[in-house]
């Protein structure tokens, strides 16, 4: 099926020229191109038009889950009839395995997997196997090791109507591809058997499958609702993919175990020859235990550290990743490339330094080093045609594109870059408060960037006390719950968002009319010219958009940012005058896909949950503590341990406080 872009938009402003130039470059075989698109110029629409015209599978690479979720939502709207998929890390919480020699401290791996994200990852690889009209929106998770596509596809269970096959053979094959039989609790990754009917709930789909047999022949193949059992559609052929990307062929498992034992013997001898007997004994015990688990259960804790043996790779050879699931002619768009490219560079180095200690001190075999993300050079060899997309391209992109940059400065809405005003630092908090109140009266939103977490929290606390509805956002409030936070800002549930590095989000917030940058003259990463341009651009989607920089010194970064903003404003205003365009604010739907995935809430200083009611008698206090204890036990039963711990701490605080009753 071809890509079919569904949109009321038509290319306007610079979009038509940018699309034509980039498509021509791709057709001419250009491997690297850069799209310099200002905030609100419709870069996502430009990418969508390029994909539609070239009709090739595409990988859209974003630098965090929040931006990836936003892009996924937009591409889903542009291509409702095509396969738009989402591929990010499936961990809600992840503590990697590590060893700290200075304190002789071993930290075991801990992780909480988000099943919804796991389903979306599996759905992404299924789409790449089954169709060419696939767009995968991904974070840097795409350069981390994944099961090999050959092994994953090789273990596929393909069923056809009229096929001669025994019921026992189908169930045996389902177990081989890691599905569990569970006739009572029908959930993702399980199957159940009722007479000659087998029902399978795959890990990559919302719906389940029903296989009806007549003797040893498949009579009917259907898609069913897993809750009600109603038939949605019928199939002539039905492929059932393995439960996990890390499925291992039975014959490969035996070879892998032999290979692990061989490596263990060599490594033990080397450690003993160096006089490191403790490390030798440790690696012997740990590896033998893991192998017994693999033999009996088919799995062990940390099995990914043996991935080189299971995939049959040579030492040092890169692991299979999502990139290996794409056909050779796929396109790569690296969004916010000035941030994403350095992130891709750093992944391998960070992973290697942690693993080296584990190997050196006998916690892992040397082959564990090959369970890693791709080096940047390996990533480059797996991508054949790349478009870097950014308002402030970095030196790598400009060098790779040989300085040839396609500019997209004119916004389809006619909006020009926001006016930038510089004000003194002294009195910045109260001066900003007055500006915030003006925006609140007009039902507009405000973004504030500060330099430290402490300042974000303190400023949020101060503004909340004086009646401003505000939230703060920093690195401790990570992952996809930010989608909910940003949606609530747009809805008007609060008016001010305070953060440290808001520019990195690629935030699409048309309701924001003011961006305030506190301490703008403190030179550094957060106040570089690129960072300032990105942050100022957050107000570029509003007709009254404005930026205030609080600074006492005109730094080189501020000067460069002002010069670039002025250049863009001049070009935009000239275009509007020439074509008689009246600027209008960007209007965008509040709907956000993927919000249902989020479980954690953001930090809210005005939350009523933590408020302690007033007590008039000791009985009221005792009654309230009793209610909290009941809630705590209930939370523990549901495995909501964070909530239970918070309630426990609240109870402890109440019991240690002295109350004066009237």
Regions found by a protein language model. Give the residues of each.
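Acidic, low-complexity intrinsically disordered tails
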Residues: 1-2, 438, 571-646, 651-662
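ASCE RecA-like P-loop NTPase motor cores
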Residues: 1-595, 634
């Amino acid at each position: 099926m071809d890509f079919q872009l569904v949109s009321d938009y038509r290319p306007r402003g610079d979009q038509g020229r940018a699309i034509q130039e980039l498509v021509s470059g791709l057709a001419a075989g250009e491997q690297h191109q850069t799209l310099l698109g200002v905030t609100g110029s419709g870069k996502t629409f430009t990418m969508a038009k390029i994909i539609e015209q070239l009709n090739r599978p595409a990988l859209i690479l974003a630098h965090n889950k929040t931006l990836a979720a936003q892009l996924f939502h937009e591409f889903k709207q542009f291509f409702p009839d095509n396969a738009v998929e989402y591929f990010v890390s499936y961990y809600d919480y992840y503590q990697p395995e590590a060893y700290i020699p200075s304190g002789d401290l071993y930290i075991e791996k801990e992780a909480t997997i988000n099943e919804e994200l796991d389903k979306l990852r599996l759905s992404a690889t299924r789409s790449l196997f089954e169709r060419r009209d696939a767009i995968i929106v991904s974070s840097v998770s795409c350069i981390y090791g994944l099961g090999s596509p050959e092994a994953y596809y090789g273990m596929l269970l393909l069923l056809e109507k009229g096929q001669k096959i025994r019921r026992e053979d189908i169930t045996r094959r389902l177990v081989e591809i890691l599905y569990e039989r569970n006739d009572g609790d029908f959930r993702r990754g399980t199957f159940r058997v009722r007479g000659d009917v087998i029902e399978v709930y795959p890990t990559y789909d919302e719906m389940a499958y029903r296989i009806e047999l007549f003797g040893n022949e498949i009579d009917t193949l259907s898609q069913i609702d897993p809750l009600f059992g109603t038939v949605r559609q019928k199939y002539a052929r039905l492929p059932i993919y393995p439960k996990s990307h890390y499925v291992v062929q039975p014959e490969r498992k035996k070879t892998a175990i032999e290979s692990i034992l061989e490596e263990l013997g060599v490594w033990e001898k080397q450690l003993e020859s160096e006089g490191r007997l403790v490390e030798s004994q440790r690696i012997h015990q740990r590896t033998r235990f893991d192998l017994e688990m693999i033999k009996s259960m088919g799995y062990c804790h940390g099995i990914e550290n043996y991935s080189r043996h299971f995939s049959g790779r040579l030492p040092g050879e890169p692991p299979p990743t999502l990139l290996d699931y794409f056909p050779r002619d796929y396109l790569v768009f690296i969004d916010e490339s000035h941030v994403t490219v350095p992130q891709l560079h750093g992944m391998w180095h960070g992973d290697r330094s942690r693993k080296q200690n584990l190997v050196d001190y006998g916690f892992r075999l040397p082959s564990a080093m090959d369970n890693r993300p791709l080096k940047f050079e390996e990533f480059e060899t797996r991508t054949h045609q790349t478009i870097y997309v950014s308002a402030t391209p970095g030196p790598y992109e400009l060098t790779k594109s040989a300085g040839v940059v396609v500019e997209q400065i004119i916004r389809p809405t006619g909006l020009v870059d926001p006016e930038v005003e510089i004000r003194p630092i002294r009195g910045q908090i109260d001066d900003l408060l007055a500006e915030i109140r003006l925006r609140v009266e007009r039902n507009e939103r405000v973004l504030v960037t500060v330099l430290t977490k402490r300042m974000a929290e303190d400023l949020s606390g101060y503004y909340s006390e004086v009646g401003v509805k505000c939230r703060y956002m920093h690195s401790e409030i990570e992952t996809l719950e930010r989608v909910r936070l940003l949606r609530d800002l747009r809805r008007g549930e609060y008016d001010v968002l305070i953060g440290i590095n808001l520019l990195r989000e690629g935030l699409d917030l048309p309701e924001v009319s003011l961006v305030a940058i506190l301490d703008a003259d403190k030179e550094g990463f957060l106040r570089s010219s690129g960072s300032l341009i990105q942050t100022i651009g957050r107000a570029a989607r509003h007709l009254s958009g404005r930026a205030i920089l609080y600074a006492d010194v005109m730094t080189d970064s501020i000067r460069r940012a002002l010069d670039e903003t002025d250049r863009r404003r001049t070009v935009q205003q000239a275009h509007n005058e020439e074509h008689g365009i009246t600027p209008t604010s960007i209007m965008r739907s509040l709907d956000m896909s993927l919000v249902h995935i989020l479980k954690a809430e953001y930090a809210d200083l005005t939350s009523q949950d933590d408020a302690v009611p007033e007590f008039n008698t000791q009985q009221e206090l005792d009654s309230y503590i009793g209610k909290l204890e009941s809630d705590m036990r209930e939370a523990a039963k549901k495995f909501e341990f964070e909530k239970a711990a918070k309630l426990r701490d609240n109870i402890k605080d109440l019991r240690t406080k002295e109350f004066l009753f009237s």
